[in-house]
Amino acid sequence: MARSNYLRIFRVLEEINRRRTIPDIYHEALEDRLVITFTQPSGPLKRSKTRRPKKEYKLQYENTKAHRVYVEILEDYPQLFIPFILATPPKSCETFKLGEFREKHDLSAVKVDLRPDIRRTLDNIANRKGFNQNRRYRRLICTLFPSGRKPATTAETQNCWAYRAAYLNAVHTIFSEQICSAMEVSPTAHSPECQAPQTTSCVEMKLPKQNYQDAIVLLELSLPIDTIKILFPSANERIICSLSPQSGRGPEPSTQIAEPGRHDSQSEQSTISQSEGYILRGASISAILSVFGPRIWGAIEKSQLRKWEKDNLSEETTDCVSIEIHPRRPHCSTCRVRIGFIDDSHFRRKTVHLSLSLSAPNPLALLILEFNIFAVETVEPSFVVFRKYIIHWMFVAVIEEARRNSKGFPKGALQCCEYIHKD
């Protein structure tokens, strides 16, 4: 019985994706089940002078149970919500085994494809039934019909600046103790190329060359499975457990549906992709604050991607943090953090220029300071700008370079750099 229920859900999903619409045959059920989902159950029936028929009590019980199941699917797997409610009548929710359904199917990778005009159909029902301002409904609409394209960044391409060998002191200042500990026990930290006393190769930063798009921070970590579960609570439990070093194997191929590296859908849930590793997306906002610390959390909040997600009512999860776990190296994972760069107009309004003349092989031609923001411009026309509280180690690199090549470097400018860096 359960198997037939599951198959019916995926048959409806396949039909919707094939037609890119909701067939007329489902419209009555769609309206009834949207009302059940987005209106609160009425509570116990009030006593009446005449005895109520048993079917009234049964109907109320079924709708209350269905409300809980529908809402849980909506919260965890919004892309599956419409096919699920169309294939699962309220009566079936009484015996529906949601835990078993999660375990047997990779629900996080499901995507429904609806034409934009279907939004009018849903909005008409919402307006008529009075739940058009319901927070869950608005978030569903933003998930299914995101406004505008998700902001891209050239930091994810080859056309970017890449900085490696971060200063350890700055890493401990910027990241939480939990993240620093995960770096220290990662395989990368013990590799021959990562044995410098003051720097680490576990941190890499990529910045766009010629624009103000988001920056990317790459971290080589060895995160405990419990931490990954906290960051990605919607990830399939079976897949998470299979990534444990004790399991000795990676997830089965059948669990992988999404294309690796795709970033074109709003994330209200974790997406797991398979290539050389397994990519988890849709991190919990509250977990990011506790796991990464307030500085990284603040930088994520200022990113263009996070602002776009908020505009689309993605308030609890974000694609700004993803983790790629390497099944052949279960102790090693690459964490990708997308952070804010700088507002273009704000940068142009408030800048103080200090000229530098350095005789390095790839000399820095200009250092730009602006309160808590600084930029480095090379001899090439491109320049990079980033927030000081995220890139302390780059500021240290500039100072060290200036000290090594002090000829022609204004002494007052060097003192200014050192003073601002202490802030």
UniProtKB/Swiss-Prot annotation:
Q: Motif Bipartite nuclear localization signal, which positions?
A: 46-69
Region called Disordered, residue ranges: 243-273
One cellular component term (GO) for this entry is:
nucleus
Question: Where in the sequence does UniProt note compositional bias of the Polar residues kind?
Answer: 243-257
Q: Where is this region: RNA recognition motif (RRM)-like domain?
A: 157-187
Give the UniProt family note: Belongs to the hrmA family.
Q: What does this protein do?
A: Probably modulates the generation of the hypoxia-typic morphotype (called H-MORPH) with altered biofilm architecture that leads to increased host inflammation, rapid disease progression, and mortality in a murine model of invasive aspergillosis.
Q: Please give the record's comment on domains.
A: The N-terminal bipartite nuclear localization signalis required for nuclear localization and generation of the H-MORPH morphotype.
Full protein name: Hypoxia responsive morphology factor B
Q: Which organism is it from?
A: Aspergillus fumigatus (strain CBS 144.89 / FGSC A1163 / CEA10)
